Amino acid sequence: MVDKYANWVSSGFGKSIAKKLGLPIPVKLKRYSEQKKPLGLEVLFGSFQQGRVAQSVKEILSHLPIVNYITEEGQIYRITEAGKMESKDDQLKFHGLIFDATEVKTLEDLKAVYNFFHPVARRIKSSGRVIILAKDPADCEDAVAAMANRGLVGFIKSLGKEVGQGIAAQIVLVSEGAERNLASTLDFLLSYKSA
């Protein structure tokens, strides 16, 4: 179906009128196409602690057709077959940001989530992806851990509104032992099929 408003706003005349009237100008989303499968998309992965989920996600990402980056102690490294190389490119933009917050147990631990996203939130490409992996609050040991994990839902909603530009922000609740089944979920969420 053709969106007449989007087409009108995309024209020079329509764009100038929309700006003067304060009307929203929709972002043109990238869509999945069998003929144009995206390869080599840059994905940055970080985690609060190196638990089972973080190890599983690193393994999964190494098998996807992406350029894999990790962050450790505030530094970004590119993962290659030879190992990890420090990334010196401050202008590098990412297709996806993935953060493993399944080990978050206290409200103070949520600072690690902020510390991961704050320096790179403006470095997400248009139609990019932001994914937080969190523990299901129902599986948490105590009320504080459940509150902290529930707070991640609010964080991802706020982040999604903040970054805009057609960027999809999602949270995946990971139950105990489900880290082995994350491959298809991450593959789908990182693809343009999930737009």
Q: Where does each model-flagged region fall?
A:
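Glycine-rich nucleotide cofactor-binding loops and adjacent beta-alpha elements
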Residues: 1-195
